[in-house]
C-alpha cells in the first residue's frame, strides 16, 4: 500500500546522498505528508506536491544543506509540536501482580489529536506493545529501543526507587525519540498510546506488513549481489561502535567499583582522625577538622559514584540496544533487497521473451529504494542524535567530576584556617 | 688529630649556651637552624650509595651507605662555602648511635630512625630495601634524624654524636669504650623482667598510656591510608583506559572525532597525574611514621621511669625489712612467723655474742641501705625532672610538627583537587565541541 506515492518521489533521490540526507531532515511537512500515506493510502497524492519541491531544489545547494545540518538542533526545538514526558511512577499492588505505572503527558498542536493535552497512565508492557506495533507498521524505520525488560532477578530490586527512576528515564527517552521522529510520531498506534483512556491492544492487529514476507528470501545464507557500499559501511560502523561502547561500559563499571572501594576506605579513614583527636589537646581541633573534611569528601564521592551508575551506565546500555535496533533495520533492508534480486534473477532467466518487466518486480525495486531512503534518513537522524547524546553524556560526566573536586576543594580550603589559627596565635605569644 | 678533635667538641657543645639560651632551646625545639649544634655547623645526608662487601660471617652482602656532610655555618654565611667535611655511614651505624643515646640519656625521648624495612606500603610502593625510592626516603629520614639530634638541647652536646659526624674510623671504638653496651645489657634485662611499681607516678602512667594510644591510632591511620592510596591509584589509572578507547573510537567518527581524540589525551594526563600525587602523599606518611616511632621512644622513657621508681621502692623495702630484723633481734620478739623464729625455738637462744655480731652487721647494712635509698631517691628525682622537661619539649615539638604535617597534607589535597578540576575542564571543553 505504500508502493503508490512514495516510490515515485523517491527514485530521483535514490543515489544522490546529499538529497537523501536533505529529505528527512528538511522539514516537518515532507515527513508529515509521508506518514499518512503509509497509513491512509487515500491521501497518497498529497505527498507528491510536498515531496517534489524538496527533491528538485536540493541538488544545487549542498552548502545550504550544511547550514541546515548545523542549525538543526535549533530548528528541531522551534518546529517541535509534540511534547511528551514520562513521570510520576506509581506502584500498583493487586492480588494477581505488582507493577509500576508511569504517567505519560502529551502536549501538542497537531490536528491529528483531538485535544491539546493528554495525561494517561501506562505500564511497561504498554510501552512494549507500542514498540512492537511501531516495528510492525513501520518496518523501514529505526524504532528506538526500550529499556531491557528482564533484569537479573535477585540482583536488582524491580521496585526500588533507583531502578524505577532509571527505567522512567529510559521510557521518557524512548517516547521523546518517537515523538521527534518525522514519520513515527504520526503513527496511529503512537497516537492511541498517548491519548486513549484504555489501550485496546488488539486494535490494528490485522495490519500485518508485507515486509514480513521477504524473510523467506534470506534464509539459507543468500548473498546479496549489489548491497550498496554505504550500507555495508553502516554495518561495519555499528560493529565497531558496539565494541567501543562495550569497552567504555566496562571501564565505567570498573571505575565505579574502584570508587566504591575507595569510599569504603575513606569511611574508615576519617573516623581514625576523630578518635585520635579525642586524646590530644592542642591538636584536637585540627584532627577533628581533618576528620570532618574527609567525611565531606566521602559524601561527594558517594554522590559522584551514584550519578555515574544511575545516569551514565544506563545511557550507555540504552545505546547498545539502540545499535541493535539499527542492525535489525539493516537486516530487514537486506531482506527486501534479497527479495528483489531473487525476483529479478528469475525474470532475467526468461529474458528472451522480451516481455516488459513484470510490475511485481518493479514494485519490489520501488520498495528497496523506498527502504533505502527511509533507512538513510533514519541513519542520519540517528547519527545526529548519537552525537548530541554523547556530547551531553560525556560533558555531564566531566561536570560531575568537576563538581566532586570542587566540593573536596572547598572542604580542604575551609580546613586551612582551622589548622593555622591557633598556631599563629601561639607564634604571637612566643 | 682525633684527640684535638674531641677537645673541640666539648667546647662546641658547651660554650656560648647561656642558661637563657638553653632555656629557649627547650621551648623552641623544632628542627631549625639557630639551635645548639646547628648554630655551629650545617649537617646533611647528601647522598646514598650501594656497596658490596663481606659481613661478619664472611658472607657476601650488599648494603647502602649514606654520605654525611658537615660544614661550619660561619664559613657558609661568609659566602666562602668550603668543601664540606664528609664521611660515609651505614644504617647499622646510625642504629648504634641511637642505641648509645638511648642508654646514655634514658630520660630523653630520643628521635627515632626511619623505618628499617618499608611498612604500611601500598602495592605500587616497593618494599625492597634496595629500591631507589626507598633509599631516597631513608636518606631524607636519616638526615632528619641527625638534625633532630643536633637541635636537641641535651643530645646535641654529646661527644659521641659529634664524633659520629666527624670521625669516620675512630668513632666505633670510642662508642664501645664508653661501656654503654654492658649498661645496655643490664638495663635490657631489668626492663624485660616483670615488675610492678607500688606507687606509680600518675603523670608518667598517663604519658605511657598516651604513647600506647598514639602508637595504636597512628598505625591504624597508616594502614587505612595505604589501602586508600591503593584504591585512589586504581580510580585514576582506570580512567586512563578511556584515553585509549576514545582514541580508537575517534577513528570511526567524523564530527566527533577530534573532540574525542583530545579528550582521550586529557584522560591519559589524568591517569598519569596520580603518580606524583601519591609520591607526595608518601612524604606525609613518613611524617606520621616518625611519630609512630616517637610514640615508642616516649613509652621507653616512661618504662625507664618505672624501672627507676621500682629500684627505689626495692631499696626502701630492703631497708625497712633490715630495720625490722634489727628490732626483732634487739627486743627478742617475733612479730610474724619466720624461719628465724622457728630455728630459735628449735635450737634455743643464741649467745649474746652472736646476737651482738648480728646486730652489728645489720647496723652496717642499714647504713648502706639508707645511703642507697638516698641515692635512689636523688636518681629518681633527677630522672623525673629531666624526663618531664624532655617530655614537655617533645609534646610541643609534636604538636607543632603534626600541625605542619596536616597543613601540608591539606595543601596537597587542595592541589590534587585543582589538578582534577583542570583536567576535567579541559576534557569537558573537548566533549562540548563534539
From Swiss-Prot, chain A:
<dbReference type="Pfam" id="PF00787">
    <property type="entry name" value="PX"/>
</dbReference>
<dbReference type="GO" id="GO:0034727">
    <property type="term" value="P:piecemeal microautophagy of the nucleus"/>
</dbReference>
<dbReference type="GO" id="GO:0032456">
    <property type="term" value="P:endocytic recycling"/>
</dbReference>
<protein>
    <recommendedName>
        <fullName>Sorting nexin-30</fullName>
    </recommendedName>
</protein>
<dbReference type="GO" id="GO:0031901">
    <property type="term" value="C:early endosome membrane"/>
</dbReference>
<dbReference type="GO" id="GO:0015031">
    <property type="term" value="P:protein transport"/>
</dbReference>
<feature type="binding site">
    <location>
        <position position="123"/>
    </location>
    <ligand>
        <name>a 1,2-diacyl-sn-glycero-3-phospho-(1D-myo-inositol-3-phosphate)</name>
    </ligand>
</feature>
<dbReference type="InterPro" id="IPR001683">
    <property type="entry name" value="PX_dom"/>
</dbReference>
<feature type="binding site">
    <location>
        <position position="167"/>
    </location>
    <ligand>
        <name>a 1,2-diacyl-sn-glycero-3-phospho-(1D-myo-inositol-3-phosphate)</name>
    </ligand>
</feature>
<dbReference type="InterPro" id="IPR028649">
    <property type="entry name" value="SNX30_BAR"/>
</dbReference>
<dbReference type="InterPro" id="IPR027267">
    <property type="entry name" value="AH/BAR_dom_sf"/>
</dbReference>
<feature type="binding site">
    <location>
        <position position="153"/>
    </location>
    <ligand>
        <name>a 1,2-diacyl-sn-glycero-3-phospho-(1D-myo-inositol-3-phosphate)</name>
    </ligand>
</feature>
<dbReference type="GO" id="GO:0000423">
    <property type="term" value="P:mitophagy"/>
</dbReference>
<feature type="compositionally biased region" description="Polar residues">
    <location>
        <begin position="1"/>
        <end position="18"/>
    </location>
</feature>
<comment type="function">
    <text>Involved in the regulation of endocytosis and in several stages of intracellular trafficking. Together with snx4, involved in autophagosome assembly.</text>
</comment>
<dbReference type="GO" id="GO:0000407">
    <property type="term" value="C:phagophore assembly site"/>
</dbReference>
<dbReference type="GO" id="GO:0005769">
    <property type="term" value="C:early endosome"/>
</dbReference>
<feature type="binding site">
    <location>
        <position position="125"/>
    </location>
    <ligand>
        <name>a 1,2-diacyl-sn-glycero-3-phospho-(1D-myo-inositol-3-phosphate)</name>
    </ligand>
</feature>
<feature type="compositionally biased region" description="Low complexity">
    <location>
        <begin position="57"/>
        <end position="66"/>
    </location>
</feature>
<feature type="domain" description="BAR">
    <location>
        <begin position="223"/>
        <end position="428"/>
    </location>
</feature>
<keyword id="KW-0472">Membrane</keyword>
<keyword id="KW-0813">Transport</keyword>
<feature type="domain" description="PX">
    <location>
        <begin position="80"/>
        <end position="201"/>
    </location>
</feature>
<feature type="region of interest" description="Disordered">
    <location>
        <begin position="1"/>
        <end position="66"/>
    </location>
</feature>
<comment type="similarity">
    <text>Belongs to the sorting nexin family.</text>
</comment>
<dbReference type="GO" id="GO:2000786">
    <property type="term" value="P:positive regulation of autophagosome assembly"/>
</dbReference>
<dbReference type="GO" id="GO:0035091">
    <property type="term" value="F:phosphatidylinositol binding"/>
</dbReference>
<keyword id="KW-0967">Endosome</keyword>
<dbReference type="InterPro" id="IPR036871">
    <property type="entry name" value="PX_dom_sf"/>
</dbReference>
<dbReference type="GO" id="GO:0061709">
    <property type="term" value="P:reticulophagy"/>
</dbReference>
<keyword id="KW-0653">Protein transport</keyword>
Amino acid at each position: 500500500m505504500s508502493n503508490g506515492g512514495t516510490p515515485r518521489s523517491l527514485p530521483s533521490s535514490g543515489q544522490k546522498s546529499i538529497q537523501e540526507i536533505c529529505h528527512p531532515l528538511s522539514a516537518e511537512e515532507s515527513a508529515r505528508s509521508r506518514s499518512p500515506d503509509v497509513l491512509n493510502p487515500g491521501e497518497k497524492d498529497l505527498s507528491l506536491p510536498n515531496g517534489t519541491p524538496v527533491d528538485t531544489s536540493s541538488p544545487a545547494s549542498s552548502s545550504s544543506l550544511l547550514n541546515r545540518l548545523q542549525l538543526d538542533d535549533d530548528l528541531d526545538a522551534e518546529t517541535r509540536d509534540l511534547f511528551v514526558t514520562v513521570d510520576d511512577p506509581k506502584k500498583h499492588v493487586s492480588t494477581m501482580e505488582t507493577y509500576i505505572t508511569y504517567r505519560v503527558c502529551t502536549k501538542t498542536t497537531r490536528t491529528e489529536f483531538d485535544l491539546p493535552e493528554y495525561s494517561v497512565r501506562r505500564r511497561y508492557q504498554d510501552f512494549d506493545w507500542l514498540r512492537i506495533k511501531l516495528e510492525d507498521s513501520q518496518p523501514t524505520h529505526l524504532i528506538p529501543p526500550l529499556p531491557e525488560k528482564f533484569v537479573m532477578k535477585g540482583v536488582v530490586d524491580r521496585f526500588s526507587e533507583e531502578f524505577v527512576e532509571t527505567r522512567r528515564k529510559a521510557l521518557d527517552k524512548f517516547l521523546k525519540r518517537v515523538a521527534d521522529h518525522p514519520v513515527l510520531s504520526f503513527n496511529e498506534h503512537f497516537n492511541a498510546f498517548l491519548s486513549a483512556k484504555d489501550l485496546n491492544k488488539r486494535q490494528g492487529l490485522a495490519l500485518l506488513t508485507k515486509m514480513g514476507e521477504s524473510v523467506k528470501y534470506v534464509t539459507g545464507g543468500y548473498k546479496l549481489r549489489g548491497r550498496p557500499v554505504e550500507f555495508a559501511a553502516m554495518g561495519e560502523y555499528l560493529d565497531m561502535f558496539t565494541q567501543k561502547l562495550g569497552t567504555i561500559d566496562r571501564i565505567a563499571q570498573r571505575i565505579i567499583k574502584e570508587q566504591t572501594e575507595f569510599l569504603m576506605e575513606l569511611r574508615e579513614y576519617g573516623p581514625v582522625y576523630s578518635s585520635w583527636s579525642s586524646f590530644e589537646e592542642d591538636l584536637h581541633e585540627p584532627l577533628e577538622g581533618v576528620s570532618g573534611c574527609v567525611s565531606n569528601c566521602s559524601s561527594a564521592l558517594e554522590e559522584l559514584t551514584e550519578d555515574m551508575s544511575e545516569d551514565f551506565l544506563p545511557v550507555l546500555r540504552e545505546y547498545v540496544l539502540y545499535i541493535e535496533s539499527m542492525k535489525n533495520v539493516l537486516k530487514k533492508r537486506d531482506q527486501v533487497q534479497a527479495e528483489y534480486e531473487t525476483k529479478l534473477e528469475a525474470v532475467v532467466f526468461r529474458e528472451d521473451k522480451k516481455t516488459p518487466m513484470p510490475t511485481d518486480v518493479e514494485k519490489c525495486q520501488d520498495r528497496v529504494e523506498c527502504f533505502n531512503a527511509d533507512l538513510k534518513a533514519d541513519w542520519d537522524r540517528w547519527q545526529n542524535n548519537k552525537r548530541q547524546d554523547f556530547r551531553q553524556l560525556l560533558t555531564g560526566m566531566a561536570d560531575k567530576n568537576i563538581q566532586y573536586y570542587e566540593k573536596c576543594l572547598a572542604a580542604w580550603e575551609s580546613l586551612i584556617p582551622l589548622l593555622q589559627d591557633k598556631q599563629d596565635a601561639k607564634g604571637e605569644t612566643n | 688529630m682525633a684527640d684535638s678533635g674531641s677537645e673541640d667538641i666539648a667546647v662546641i657543645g658547651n660554650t656560648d649556651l647561656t642558661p637563657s639560651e638553653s632555656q629557649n632551646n627547650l621551648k623552641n625545639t623544632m628542627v631549625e637552624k639557630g639551635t645548639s649544634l646547628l648554630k655551629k655547623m650545617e649537617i646533611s645526608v647528601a647522598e646514598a650509595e650501594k656497596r658490596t662487601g663481606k659481613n661478619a660471617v664472611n658472607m657476601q652482602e650488599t648494603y647502602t651507605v649514606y654520605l654525611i656532610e658537615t660544614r661550619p655555618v660561619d664559613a657558609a654565611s661568609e659566602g666562602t662555602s668550603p668543601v664540606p667535611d664528609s664521611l660515609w655511614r651505614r644504617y647499622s651505624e646510625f642504629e648504634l648511635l641511637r642505641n648509645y643515646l638511648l642508654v646514655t640519656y634514658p630520660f630523653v625521648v630520643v628521635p627515632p630512625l626511619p623505618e628499617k624495612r618499608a611498612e604500611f606500603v601500598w602495592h605500587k610502593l616497593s618494599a625492597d630495601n634496595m629500591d631507589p625510592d626507598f633509599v631516597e626516603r631513608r636518606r631524607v629520614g636519616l638526615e632528619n634524624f641527625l638534625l633532630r639530634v643536633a637541635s636537641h638541647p641535651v643530645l646535641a652536646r654529646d661527644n659521641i654524636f659529634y664524633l659520629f659526624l666527624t670521625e669516620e674510623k675512630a668513632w666505633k671504638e670510642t662508642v664501645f669504650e664508653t661501656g654503654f653496651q654492658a649498661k645496655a645489657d643490664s638495663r635490657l634485662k631489668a626492663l624485660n623482667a616483670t615488675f610492678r611499681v607500688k606507687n606509680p607516678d600518675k603523670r608518667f602512667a598517663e604519658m605511657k598510656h598516651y604513647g600506647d594510644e598514639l602508637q595504636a591510632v597512628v598505625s591504624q591511620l597508616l594502614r587505612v591510608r595505604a589501602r586508600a592510596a591503593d584504591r585512589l591509584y586504581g580510580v585514576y589509572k582506570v580512567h586512563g583506559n578511556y584515553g585509549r578507547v576514545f582514541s580508537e573510537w575517534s577513528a570511526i567518527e567524523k564530527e566527533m572525532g577530534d573532540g574525542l581524540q583530545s579528550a582521550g589525551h586529557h584522560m591519559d594526563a589524568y591517569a598519569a597525574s596520580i603518580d606524583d600525587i601519591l609520591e607526595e602523599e608518601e612524604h606525609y606518611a613518613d611524617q606520621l611514621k616518625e611519630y609512630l616511632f616517637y610514640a615508642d621512644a616516649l613509652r621507653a622513657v616512661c618504662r625507664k621511669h618505672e624501672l627507676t621508681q621500682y629500684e627505689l621502692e626495692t631499696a626502701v623495702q630492703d631497708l625497712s625489712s633490715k630495720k625490722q630484723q634489727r628490732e626483732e633481734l634487739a627486743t627478742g620478739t617475733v612479730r610474724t612467723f619466720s624461719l628465724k623464729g622457728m630455728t630459735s625455738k628449735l635450737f634455743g637462744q643464741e649467745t649474746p655474742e652472736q646476737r651482738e655480731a648480728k646486730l652489728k652487721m645489720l647496723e652496717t647494712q642499714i647504713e648502706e641501705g639508707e645511703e642507697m635509698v638516698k641515692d635512689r631517691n636523688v636518681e629518681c628525682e633527677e630522672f623525673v625532672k629531666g624526663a618531664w622537661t624532655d617530655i614537655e619539649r617533645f609534646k610541643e615539638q609534636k604538636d607543632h610538627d603534626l600541625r605542619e604535617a596536616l597543613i601540608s597534607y591539606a595543601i596537597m589535597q587542595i592541589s590534587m583537587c585543582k589538578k582534577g578540576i583542570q583536567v576535567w575542564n579541559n576534557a569537558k571543553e573537548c566533549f562540548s565541541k563534539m
